[in-house]
Amino acid sequence: MDLPGLIHDFLLVFLGLGLILGGLGVVLLPNPIYSAFSLGLVFVCISLFYILSNSHFVAAAQLLIYVGAINVLIIFAVMFINGSEYSKDFHLWTVGDGITSVVCTSLFVSLITTIPDTSWYGIIWTTKANQIIEQDLISNSQQIGIHLSTDFFLPFEFISIILLVALIGAIAVARQ
């Protein structure tokens, strides 16, 4: 989306705050229904980020797959869980929460200090448009594949990491 700089920056900050608040809601809200709706907010904000970066196909796929399927499935599964077991024995803060907070905060600080010092020349070099062959000689699905492996490589990898974490979490919950 081609927006003036000030409006674009405002929308980025607004969506970033939505992501942060939604992520905190997923983790901190004791009711699983509210956590699932917060996860839906996170997915919608990510989709809007993709729209701001002019990747409309990835935004549509994000909305259809994550909000339309995964989040609805999570809400449907949570509806069958007995809600009374979550309300009893609720402790505001435990030792595990403290350890997790320290680990997440240290990881966040290390990322914040590492990312500005990283040379992104190699990543920018692989996403140059002149490396892509003639656009007229390939089909639309091949163009999507080329863009996913060049221009949208990092978002594609982030999505695969999120799916891996969700799979590991589902296995851990199923084993208990």
Swiss-Prot record:
It comes from the Eukaryota. InterPro entries: NAD(P)H-Q_Oxidoreduct_6, NADH_UbQ/plastoQ_OxRdtase_su6, Nuo/plastoQ_OxRdtase_6_NuoJ. GO terms for cellular component: chloroplast thylakoid membrane. Its EC number is 7.1.1.-. It is found in: Plastid, Chloroplast thylakoid membrane. Gene3D superfamilies: NADH-ubiquinone/plastoquinone oxidoreductase chain 6, subunit NuoJ (1.20.120.1200). One of its GO terms (molecular function) is quinone binding. Keywords: Chloroplast, Membrane, NAD, NADP, Plastid, Plastoquinone, Quinone, Thylakoid, Translocase, Transmembrane, Transmembrane helix, Transport. Belongs to the complex I subunit 6 family. This is NAD(P)H-quinone oxidoreductase subunit 6, chloroplastic. It comes from Lactuca sativa. The gene is ndhG.
